[in-house]
Amino acid sequence: MVYRPSDARTSSPLASVKTAYGRCGEESTFTVAALRAVGIPARQVYTPRWAHTDDNHAWVEAWADGHWYFFGACEPEPVLNLGWFHSPASRGMLMHPKVFGRYNGPEEIMLETPNYTEINVIDNYAPTAKAIVTVTDAEGKPVADAKVEFKIYNYAEFYTVATKYTDAEGKASLTAGKGDMLVWASRNGQFGYAKISFGKDDALQLALNRKEGEAYSLPMDLVPPVEGANIPEVTPEQRAENDRRMAQEDSIRNAYVATMMTEKQAKEWIDKLYGNTLQPEKKEKLVNFLVASRGNHQTLKDFLSPIRKEKDAVSWEEIRAIWILESLSAKDLRDVTLDVLNDHLLTNISDWEKIETDLFKRMYLNPPRIANEMLTPYKKVLREAIEKTVYQSVPDSMKRDPKVLIEWCRKEIKINNELNSQQIPISPMGVWKARVADEKSRDIFFVAAYRSMGWASAAWIDEVTGKVQILNEEFAKEDVNFDTAEAAQSRKGVLQATYTPIRSVEDPKYYSHFTLSKFKNGTFQLLNYDEGETDMGDGTTWRNLLKYGRELDEGYYMMVTGTRLASGAVLSNSTFFTIEPGKTTTVDLVMRESKDQVQVIGNFNSEATYRPVDSTEQRSILRTCGRGYFVVAVLGVGQEPTNHALRDIAALGNDFEQWGRKMVFLFPSEEQYKKFNADEFKGLPSIITYGIDVDDSIRKEIVQAMNLNNSILPVFIIADTFNRVVFVSQGYTIGLGEQLMKVVHGL
């Protein structure tokens, strides 16, 4: 399998095989399973968050000759203890694998559960230091059993990477890479926090002197560890042999991928099944589903074929089948099973005839997915079981009252969060049989049970807050409270944020530039305003979310903003405020700037492809440039702004040669390239690769991501393979070469 981003749910190893690609967590899960299957001890190593860039990563360690050796899962290098992440790992602050059962080795224990022990292996990858945190009350007395969270700034939030509890002397410790973290301590509703610099601060005293309701802002500068990778040597012979083996492995994978349905094959199959009875747009959707299902396409075909019974018409059952497929995520299409699809299709909605419009029929369809659980069949069996038990002795007038089901869950399901140590959701039928569950699995069970009853109503888990909600008879959302066995509308206010644009950020993005979190049990919990289908980083924007106001539950909140510099350092600002019912709260969204350091100003997908002028096949920017920084340009041949830019770069050709990183110069078309004469610009560095921007895709991506004019060339960016853009220029610019080199020197 090869790398491709996807959503946060991790595919099983066999599902990843059927897909032939996956994100790093799936690649490493697959590789660990494969090694263990042939008797080689292996474990997944995970850094919850990098400190120097907005991302995380997972890879593999394997045991050989008495030692653990790391490698890049499905991206193996010629030798062990080498991977593309080698340099980033040297800037890591925390890395941990899970060890089965109890563990008494030399590594620091991060978490101990009845099933596994989580250990800290950061010492194997980066220089480290230990720091001791002492938590006191407002009077300076040590506080025992205080919760201490060590947080890294990442994706515009302070993310908890380690949680400890203080001893009788109020102390807790952590060993980490030599960079900055935020330490957050809490107990009995009071909290306190401060920055700690590992390697500089060996001790920190932290008072619980903050409380809910205080309004203020706090700027903070955070510096990640410096890079210090010790890269093992790879001989040319080793590299050549590795390339040969990779090519062979690619051929095996590609032979399997060739068995998946192409768009043409899918279209032919759909046309044969439905003829002219199905609307073209619905046909197109089904074609897309079959192609997107990868190695799971036979499951979809087996789902659609048996319900095709009328040659001259499309039944409601078939329409519902299409709606079910539409409700699935891209990953669900790749691993959903036939029994799941049939269970959700064949379990009828009792009130189906009462629902007047297609819109509401789709609303009450109640799709298979609830949260990030493994999809299982449950509707038919669960509905029959609930009717015979929960509602058997209930008066007819109350058989559709959600309070009956809420009260049953409160009384009959025992909550034990410790038993589910890995927090993998228990299936709805598993909860029904055991009557014991963690809170998250209980929530999923309630939604599953509610949906199974076939009522003209809806239940779900809110994606932003994680609350269980239902739709009442007046089509209003109500929060389910299992403590009181009630469902009621929450009290809300409005948050509005003002923003004065800085040079590099016109419309701040959620997760890239800011986040919101709500106070609960002494700490703040992130609100998830997600967009897209990747595991992290795709969010909405200030303009769409907060410029005109956003309704939020009453309570105490924190807004975190951050400007990521090219060095990896962050200029953050945290604003604390309260949302009151029926009122509008206005805060400033502050993006801090640095006058001295290079800043991250946008994103560019380094996996984007182009066609080199000397090739007939497309190639990614990443493959051309390797890991690190690079320059990408889209040129306007013969245009004065482009000529100026090329001459400025040629004038500093030696400087760019010394820098040594790749530059990819693209032309809008083959015809444009044929008009280009490099001899007109003597001195252009040899590190330039020329190519064709196929379908104008790279230019469009840069223009959209950087909010540029759609028609002006040239466009230049400096970016890196963490997809960070640190420089952009468009159109006529004098001294472009000097500007580029100024940024290069600041990296």
Where are the predicted features?
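Short, ordered, surface-exposed loop/turn motifs in non-cytosolic proteins
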Residues: 138-157, 178-180, 401, 502-532
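Short, acidic Ser/Thr/Gly-rich low-complexity loop/linker segments typical of extracellular
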Residues: 154-176, 522-546
